[in-house]
Amino acid sequence: MMLITILLFLAAGLAEIGGGYLVWLWLREAKPAGYGIAGALILIVYGILPTFQSFPSFGRVYAAYGGVFIVLAVLWGWLVDRKTPDLYDWIGAFICLIGVCVILFAPRG
């Protein structure tokens, strides 16, 4: 279950960031409309992926996903935009991952 949870979060994050990036390129950098259309379709996939999570609460899934998204966004900025994260970016991302673990795996009655 843990591996599926992680893979779904990673897939959703890449879909959200990748789709948003294509829309960004279309609107901000004058790329062809196909970029925007592809980005919109990928963003639809992003909306569907979290429904496959086994956790029953929408809010809990999206709150935990938010932490994963932050880490992926820092990595995207580093690898795609070539903007090297500083120490505080990494510390913040690590804190977010701790939050994800608390939200998803804390014992509940």
Curated annotation (Swiss-Prot):
One of its GO terms (cellular component) is plasma membrane. It is a multi-pass membrane protein. It comes from the Bacteria. The chain crosses the membrane at residues 6-26, 32-52, 61-81, 87-107. It is found in: Cell membrane. Disulfide bonds: none annotated. SUPFAM superfamilies: Multidrug resistance efflux transporter EmrE. Its main location: membrane. InterPro entries: UPF0060. Keywords: Cell membrane, Membrane, Transmembrane, Transmembrane helix. PANTHER family: UPF0060 MEMBRANE PROTEIN YNFA. Belongs to the UPF0060 family. This is UPF0060 membrane protein YfjF. The lineage of its organism: Bacteria, Bacillati, Bacillota, Bacilli, Bacillales. The gene is yfjF.
